[in-house]
């Protein structure tokens, strides 16, 4: 397992690029990353205007904004137009989210295309195809982060979006992201009128090893943030573990009736490092 020290968003708010006012308003919500969507949420005839909306929003966003843009699947003409727009403007989003990824070569191609234009965004991949799942270690090796796309994967598998139906894919993502030290973000919740379902799902994916969660509605941000963002109590507990193991000269220590040792200290250091990285990049106090 690779220690995770990079800044990983804990909440990503998806907003269709259908209205400039809507996109600008979304920037006011307390999300770590504000994503403008050019893919599924934008009908084909509206995609050209959606690109204009994204370009205007990017060029007028504050420098501290952590903006992402989800592009159309490579191999489509819409993806080509997306790339031309992104590489010809004066501002590039912090994150590019790819859709329907199947092979590592697609990610390498996109990264090299941006680099040729002097652009170096972080590239997150929507994991929603069987091909990506079955080659996940190689796919994750060329990514900066993974985002679970449950709807398309469930449609391909012919199963409903349930915890048991999606568990194998989620576990594979967590293992791949841990191996390569990259972010792992859970799928959006589609049962918007059932907050108890959302709360349970957030806790379950946190326990599984996910770092963040996507959402399509700002009303979910408070619950996502309160559960997944670094909190003072967790950071304090991690600090106490590292101190206890250090005092035991790197061996086994007893802390509040619990045995802790080197592996616990390594996890605690990861918690402290990732919390510090998150605060430096995403905390609104640094905006």
What are these regions (language model features)?
Residues 1-287:
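Expand to "…catalyze enediolate/carbanion chemistry for C-C bond making/breaking, isomerization
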């Amino acid at each position: 397992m690779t220690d995770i020290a990079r800044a990983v968003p804990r909440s990503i708010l998806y907003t269709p690029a259908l209205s400039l006012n809507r996109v600008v308003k979304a920037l006011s919500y307390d999300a770590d990353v504000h994503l403008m969507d050019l893919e599924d949420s934008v009908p084909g005839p509206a995609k050209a205007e959606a690109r204009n909306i994204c370009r205007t929003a990017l060029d007028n966003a504050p420098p501290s904004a952590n903006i992402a843009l989800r592009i159309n699947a490579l191999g489509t003409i819409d993806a080509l137009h997306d790339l031309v727009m992104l590489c010809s403007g004066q501002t590039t989003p912090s994150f590019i989210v790819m859709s329907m990824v199947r092979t590592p070569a697609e990610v390498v191609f996109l990264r090299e295309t941006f680099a040729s234009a002097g652009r170096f965004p972080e590239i997150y991949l929507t994991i929603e195809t069987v091909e990506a799942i079955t080659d996940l270690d190689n796919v994750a090796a060329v990514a900066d982060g993974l985002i679970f796309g449950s709807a398309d994967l469930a449609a391909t598998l012919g199963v409903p979006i349930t915890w048991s139906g999606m568990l194998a894919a989620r576990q594979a993502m967590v293992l791949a992201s841990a191996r390569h030290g990259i972010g792992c973000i859970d799928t959006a919740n589609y049962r918007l009128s059932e907050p108890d379902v959302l709360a349970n799902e957030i806790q379950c994916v946190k326990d599984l090893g996910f770092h963040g969660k996507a959402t399509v509605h700002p009303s979910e941000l408070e619950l996502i943030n309160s559960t997944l963002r670094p909190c003072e109590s967790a950071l304090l507990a991690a600090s106490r573990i590292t101190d206890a193991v250090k005092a035991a000269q790197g061996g086994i220590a007893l802390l509040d009736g619990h045995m802790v040792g080197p592996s616990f200290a390594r996890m605690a250091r990861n918690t402290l490092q990732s919390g510090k990285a998150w605060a430096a990049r995403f905390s609104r106090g640094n905006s």
